[in-house]
Amino acid sequence: MSRLAEAWRVLTARDASLNSLLGDRARYRQSSAPVVTQESALRNSVWWAGSVLRANLVSTFPVDVVRRVGALDVPVPSPGQFIAEPFPDVSSNEFRFSTQMDKDRYGNAVGIIRERTVKGDYPMAVELQNMSTVSAVMDGGKIVQWRCGRDYYAPRDIWHEKQYTISGLALGLNPLTYAARDLGIYESASDWALDWFAGGALPRVTLKNTQPDKIGPENAQEARDKFRESTRGGDIFVHGVEWEWTPATTSAATSGFLEQQESSEQAICRFIGVPAMMVGVDGGTGNITYANVTQANLQFLIMNLGPSVIRLEEYWSRKALPKPWHVKLNTDALLRLDPQGKADLMVKLNAMKVRTPTELRQLDNLGPYDADQIAEIGTFAALG
């Protein structure tokens, strides 16, 4: 019987379990692959290009502060410096680039709130942290404390953006971990279990005991069995009364997900959420064409980038602004037209009375017509 057939038989058995699928040999199988970090994952050029593309776009969208009045969003002056400069000498563009890169690599972006407004207690200065120095002290799926370097902080003193979330866990996941989690059934059916679950000898995430307790001889075997059980499946290893979540390093099994899946460059683009053609990869379909660059960008915005932008707007609005004010990222900047297309659109908007000439001129940083310009336009109209 082939390995695939045997895996399928065990999976469909009444009392099927992962242990019976792997067998005793897998229980003690060791991985010779090295532990890699999220930085080394960026060596993959397609992964790097996709991450940078997403971060570049999100960080350069113009930021507007608006107030909801009836059915309209009315622009209002920013209530403070935080929207334009979240930390001294750190612009909004730089801040958003860093947080987007961290979210795509770790699933989380963390900063320490160093200063708050006197009125409303909203953040005025947030110092982003290197994720390799960040830990989350947790009680079940709830964050009770953050550790940044050697210092501990209450959750209210932390700016925490996240993506790829799952129910019951207050932390986000990186795209590969999220994909690996949700592809479990497919992985087993394709004989993935024997390579994925048995091949990783290190935990995906380390949970460190923060108590000074020592393990005595009577508990050594129990601790050894627990460690072997967790690391065998690439799962989280829990030890001690209190523990800390550390996201900076992942096991070879997690970081090698693309290689184990024999993923193509197109698959990498699917994991990161970027159309293949935008990072120089052949899409492989051969039949998807766009009339212009704008249509391609629109598809990317709607299908890939838009949802994360909406979540970012919601978080910033909830954490940094009083109600009913909220943050809007002007995603129209992604849909910049070529000169001819822009001119045609302006003519149509004016003819359909959707925009006035003054509003359209503002898009080119031009003021309203002055008296001489109006007279000149009248002369041209008279000449036909």
Predicted regions and their residues:
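Periodic self-assembly scaffolds
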Residues: 336-362
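Divalent metal-cofactor coordination and adjacent catalytic microenvironments
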Residues: 100-108, 135, 299-334, 343, ...
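Structured, contiguous alpha/beta core segments that scaffold functional sites
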Residues: 1-257, 261-263, 267-270, 274, ...
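Short proline/glycine- and acidic-rich turn/helix-capping motifs at secondary-structure junctions
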Residues: 242-246, 332-337
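Short acidic alpha-helical/loop segments enriched in Asp/Glu that coordinate divalent cations
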Residues: 276-288, 314-323
